[in-house]
Amino acid sequence: MSKSHLLKYLLISPNLPVGGFCYSEGMESFLHNKNLTDSNSVKELIISELEIGQIRLDARLLLDFFDIFNQINDRKNLKGNLQKLMSLDKWILSSKDSLEMREQQIQMAKSLFDLTKEFGFEYLYENDKKSSWSLAWSWACYCFEITKLEMVENFFYAWSANQLSAALRIIPIGSTKAQLIQRDLLAIISKVSKEIMDKEIDDLYFGNVGLAMAQQNHNDLYTKLFRN
């Protein structure tokens, strides 16, 4: 097993979330409106997001960032690629539907950049410290020499594990049921990841506005689970 294959567990481990934070991303609002009542409703919400939610766009941008890093490393069109990198990063960050979501992205990205710096991979391409989670994730995977397909799969896995960690405290659903949900999500994550690999950004379909509305209906998305 290669070193890069092992390094990916630094990113996806639910026991070591980046920066020690977990975000509920609107679950409290769903719970208040009685849309989340049990493990099945949590599972349906996560599946819906994986299949038609904005998380797909975040995942697709990973590939663009990864390709840009490769071109920059090869000294190809440095100015143009740096401009494209910053433009895409600002675009995906501004696409978030609430201030809390943007702050979440910035915090998680900063923590991941701090981690990669400790591993000897300091990010030097932007002066603006307000970067997106997708950019930081792609940078980490590029530095750790993780393949693009694994990068996308791990991204979806980590996101779904984060949602389940939040659901454990908010609903709660119980740790055993959360593990069963995570198991059932594996096939969907694999399918969706391959779809993302084969599509351009303009070809992605998004039709799930429920979570975006839920995120706007409550003020504090930050759930402090690992700072005890």
Curated annotation (Swiss-Prot):
Gene3D superfamilies in alphabetical order: Urease accessory protein UreF (1.10.4190.10)
Keyword Chaperone: yes
Signal peptide, first to last residue: none
Superkingdom of the organism of origin: Bacteria
Keywords assigned by UniProt, alphabetized: Chaperone, Cytoplasm, Nickel insertion
Subunit structure: UreD, UreF and UreG form a complex that acts as a GTP-hydrolysis-dependent molecular chaperone, activating the urease apoprotein by helping to assemble the nickel containing metallocenter of UreC. The UreE protein probably delivers the nickel.
Family membership noted in the UniProt record: Belongs to the UreF family.
Name the record gives this protein: Urease accessory protein UreF
Gene expressing this chain: ureF
